[in-house]
Amino acid sequence: MGRTLYDKIWDEHVVHTEEDGTSILYIDRHLVHEVTSPQAFEGLREAGRKVWRISSIVATADHNTPTTGWELGYDGITDLVSKEQITTLDANIKEFGAAAFFPFMSKRQGIVHVIGPENGATLPGMTVVCGDSHTSTHGAFGALAHGIGTSEVEHVMATQTLLAKKAKNMLIKVEGAVTKGVTAKDIVLAIIGKIGTAGGTGYTIEFAGSAIRALSMEGRMTVCNMAIEGGARAGLVAVDAKTIEYLKGRLLAPGTDSVTGKFVGGPEWDMAARYWATLHSDADATFDAVVELDASQILPQVSWGTSPEMVLSIEDRVPDPEKEKDANKRGAIERALTYMGLEPGKALNDLYIDKVFIGSCTNSRIEDMREAAAVVKHIGQKVAKNVKLAMVVPGSGLVKEQAEREGLDKIFIAAGFEWREPGCSMCLAMNADRLEPGERCASTSNRNFEGRQGAGGRTHLVSPAMAAAAAVHGHFVDIRKFV
């Protein structure tokens, strides 16, 4: 019987399996940041242990890093707890070591799920873990990647393994071509809207179909990033020519000259590429669940509530809880409407916003910057007067550098956007970038829970194009009219 992509990677990394199904899984790559690592390093220190395989660790600071004030250096980190976590990471990596460390303000520093792939730390067929739930992002490369807790971070550091039980296989096929203006973010929001935030619970999802294959690697990362929001611990996309081409010349990838940083190929690259090409589900592989979507029917999406599954197309209206027969769902809708300050039946394109955030590990790569800048340039207007703040936060120093080479920063700044330094920023209320109570935000991030972007803040999840258009109009609009 054929095997799924998930089966193949799992089978190659299982060290031992108990009768109850609990397995010891070997971990290839461990991504580390400043929030979930301090306790793990301290645990190693107290036990007198060393990191088992230093070459597996790639570290950066991202959650707490400020996106302004870099001219002040570490003194620009105004929150003392944030500063302590960042300096503690510096000290821990100095003591324990890492294959690569991109500290605060370094050229390659950025969001861990952006810097991993762009530096070649994420390779097809790997098992990848990080103390962050959106580690599923790396599944775009045909890698088995998922988040782990702080105690597991220590366990992986000490043993290079993880205790896990194998999940079931789910296939989500998105066939056909999307219409103009519909992006990877819209595809994954539509998927979550269909299966719900618990639909993928107990599964590893493989995203497939012509619409997924048509996506760039950046787009595939966006889709896999939000697999966790659909309830799955991990999401995968099969390796193809786009995957392999993307990896050429990446800092830590095989075939890259360590001095020039350029792709030179060679036997190691050839062997790796041949293996990577096998990383797809067999034609006769069976899945425990299959979900299908027609890409042509997916419209630009906007979340309206306090869960990613509370999402509608821009043509829709805010739902009426009275029309929901299920009492639990009706109650959830009512609570969401109250928190979000919305009334049933209100058109989504009538929602005025206070702030705009373009960034996060979901949408802060160069393709996202280009997408948003193109919309701003095409519309040719400045940020609307009712919008208090519109900020663009590149996902890494390399993304920022590339965007500035292309002049994208000038487009944003001329239109009244703030062009920031890289970091997690307003995705979560853990740094200086946050919403005030009652403020409504068009955000390209991945979570719209109560208080996610700041106590009392109201988050609407959208694509970079939708966020950019909302910034200059002051409210949500159908992006298809402007592309």
Swiss-Prot record:
The keyword Iron applies. Binds 1 [4Fe-4S] cluster per subunit. Its cofactor is [4Fe-4S] cluster. One of its GO terms (biological process) is L-leucine biosynthetic process. Keywords: 4Fe-4S, Amino-acid biosynthesis, Branched-chain amino acid biosynthesis, Iron, Iron-sulfur, Leucine biosynthesis, Lyase, Metal-binding. InterPro entries: 3-IsopropMal_deHydase_lsu, Acnase/IPM_dHydase_lsu_aba_1/3, Acoase/IPM_deHydtase_lsu_aba, Aconitase_4Fe-4S_BS, Aconitase_4Fe-4S_dom, IPM_dehydratase_rel_enz, IPMI_cat. One of its GO terms (molecular function) is metal ion binding. [4Fe-4S] cluster binds at C361, C424, C427. Pfam families: Aconitase. Its EC number is 4.2.1.33. It catalyses: (2R,3S)-3-isopropylmalate = (2S)-2-isopropylmalate. Pathway: Amino-acid biosynthesis; L-leucine biosynthesis; L-leucine from 3-methyl-2-oxobutanoate: step 2/4. Belongs to the aconitase/IPM isomerase family. LeuC type 1 subfamily. Heterodimer of LeuC and LeuD. Catalyzes the isomerization between 2-isopropylmalate and 3-isopropylmalate, via the formation of 2-isopropylmaleate. This is 3-isopropylmalate dehydratase large subunit.
